[in-house]
Swiss-Prot record:
Pathway: Alkaloid biosynthesis. Mainly expressed in roots. It comes from Strychnos nux-vomica (Poison nut). Keywords: Heme, Iron, Membrane, Metal-binding, Monooxygenase, Oxidoreductase, Transmembrane, Transmembrane helix. Belongs to the cytochrome P450 family. It is a single-pass membrane protein. It catalyses: norfluorocurarine + reduced [NADPH--hemoprotein reductase] + O2 = 18-hydroxynorfluorocurarine + oxidized [NADPH--hemoprotein reductase] + H2O + H(+). Its cofactor is heme. This is Norfluorocurarine oxidase. It is found in: Membrane. PANTHER family: CYTOCHROME P450 71A2-LIKE, CYTOCHROME P450 FAMILY 71 PROTEIN. InterPro entries: Cyt_P450, Cyt_P450_CS, Cyt_P450_E_grp-I, Cyt_P450_sf.
């Protein structure tokens, strides 16, 4: 105390503290001096994880209303940028797409996809460009999708027949969700593996595998965000579940690979790139690339498995979810359903089957699906990206290594872009100026930029055909005199957000 009362010493200490303060101000990290996006208060260790909730797209939308369309959260020790406006999405997925095109490392996706050798989770780089090119040019091109159209038509025909049989055998309401999930599984399985592998037993295994994948991909892995807590996975059972699921997927796909290779060897079959119309399945195409029969492309065995599993996990769930929400909105809006009935039946003109040409004339069908996907994008929070360098976005500094989440669900309901945003109004798309391809950033149900969904054309083709055939063949009403406005539209939690309860309706076959 006496030392502090010494005027000379006090002056010297004051000067020293001032110099230290000045030094810190002058030489502090540039990041500290730069303007960063607004953030809600965070807790020690967990950061903002406690604010995410079971439906994160809704929680993050709520936070964005308070903190802005570009906000910075912390999930554990990881900075996470959340974009909730079209302007912010455009900055990330168009203006600075290359900087934000990689994926953050994920323990779960790494284990399920052979070290992220698939398309969805692979980090941005030469390998990702190669596998995406294979998917776009060899598996999911417009020509390839057309060559698989007979599969879509056959499987939807089977679905219609099965619903008819169910209506004949029982007057009870029909669980439409059961029929549509079976449909999407069958279409993807036949396209990926060939019809031989889509018998009842294999479909049971595939359905169980997909359910497991979907569940575990939605699990929070503490080690990804709080590295020193990674050991917890051993005690929660996550590591064990993950190992079993990865083995289950590997054994299933490996069995299909072995069968295809034996058959190709015995029959001398090979993929002819000049003849896209052949009934070749995805596995045949990928194995020809693996065996060096397609010039300019190369894949190892694990990559073949990872890409095939991508087709299942990405394709089945998103397509089924889109169909399911469309049916729900039609049941909830009888006047829209009536208008769609009229269009489909006028275009079909009494024919027993709807053709591809017919679908091209169904303008109202297309806007019904667009409006459904505006309100219910299958993956509301687009798969996370990661910044590869320091960058400035909308006047804010974003550090390299920041994870980025684009809230497509919030953007699709933003009243700044959508009049009466919470209402289901297909007519808003009738001017035809907006599509799914990610050019309009107020509407990005399938993402945009380099990381947009490569299966977009295929997914929309399946959804359109399914809804058109259901509306063509059946009339639907809610059971027990239920009021449309009372239909439960509660969402289930998950990476892909389903309707929590299945769509159940009274179904009556029409005379065409």
């Amino acid at each position: 105390m006496e030392l502090l009362l010494n005027p000379s010493l006090f002056s010297l200490l004051s000067l020293l503290f001032f110099v230290i303060f000045l030094f810190k101000r002058l030489y502090a990290s540039p990041t500290c001096q730069r303007k960063v996006p607004p953030s809600p208060p965070k807790l020690p260790v967990v950061g903002n994880l406690h604010q995410v909730g079971s439906l994160p797209h809704r929680s993050l939308q709520s936070l964005s209303k308070k903190y802005g369309p570009l906000m910075l959260l912390h999930f554990g020790s990881v900075p996470v940028l959340v974009a909730s406006s079209a302007e912010a999405a455009r900055e990330i997925m168009k203006n600075h797409d290359v900087v934000f095109s990689t994926r953050p490392k994920s323990n779960i996706s790494d284990k399920l996809t052979y070290g992220s050798k698939d398309v969805a989770f692979s980090p941005y780089g030469e390998y990702w460009r190669r596998v995406r090119s294979i998917c776009v040019n060899h598996l999911l091109s417009n020509q390839r999708v057309k060559s698989f159209r007979h599969i879509m038509e056959e499987e939807t025909r089977k679905m219609i027949e099965n619903i008819n049989e169910r209506c004949v055998s029982s007057s009870l309401p029909v669980n439409l969700s059961d029929f549509t999930i079976t449909l999407t599984n069958s279409i993807i399985c036949t396209m990926a593996f060939g019809r031989k592998h889509c018998d009842v037993e294999n479909m049971r295994k595939i359905k169980a595998m997909l359910a497991g994948f979907e569940e575990i991909l939605s699990v929070f892995d503490a080690g990804d965000y709080i590295p020193w807590l990674a050991w917890v996975n051993r005690f929660t059972g996550l590591d064990d579940r993950l190992g079993k699921l990865a083995k289950q997927g590997d054994e299933l796909v490996e069995g299909v690979i072995e069968e295809h290779m034996k058959r190709k060897k015995a029959e001398g079959q090979r993929y002819d790139a000049a003849d896209q119309a052949k009934g070749t399945d995805f596995m045949d195409i990928l194995l020809d690339i693996y065996q060096g029969r397609v010039p300019g492309f190369a894949l190892d065995r694990d990559s073949v498995k990872a890409v095939i599993l991508d087709m299942f996990t990405g394709g089945t769930d998103t397509i089924y979810t889109s169909i399911d929400w469309t049916i729900a909105e039609l049941l909830r809006h009888p006047m829209v359903l009536k208008k769609l009935h009229t269009e489909v039946r006028e275009v079909a003109q009494g024919k027993s089957e709807i053709t591809e040409e017919d679908l091209g004339k169904m303008a109202y069908l297309k806007v019904v699906i667009k409006e459904t996907l505006r309100l219910h994008p299958p993956i509301p929070l687009l798969l996370p990206r990661e910044s590869t360098q320091d960058i400035s976005i909308m006047g804010y500094h974003i550090s390299a290594g920041t994870q980025v989440i684009v809230n497509a669900w919030a953007i699709g309901r933003d009243p700044l872009y959508w009049e009466n945003a919470e209402e289901f109004r297909p007519e808003r798309f009738m001017d035809g100026n907006m599509d799914f391809r990610g050019f309009n950033f107020e509407y990005i149900p399938f993402g945009a930029g380099r990381r947009s969904c490569p299966a977009l054309a295929f997914a929309i083709a399946v959804v359109e055909l399914t809804i058109a055939k259901l509306v063509h063949k059946f009339d639907f009403t809610l059971p027990d005199g239920g009021k449309p406005e009372d239909l439960d539209m509660t969402e289930a939690s998950g990476t892909t957000v389903h309707k929590q309860l299945p769509n159940v309706a009274n179904v009556v076959a029409t005379r065409n």
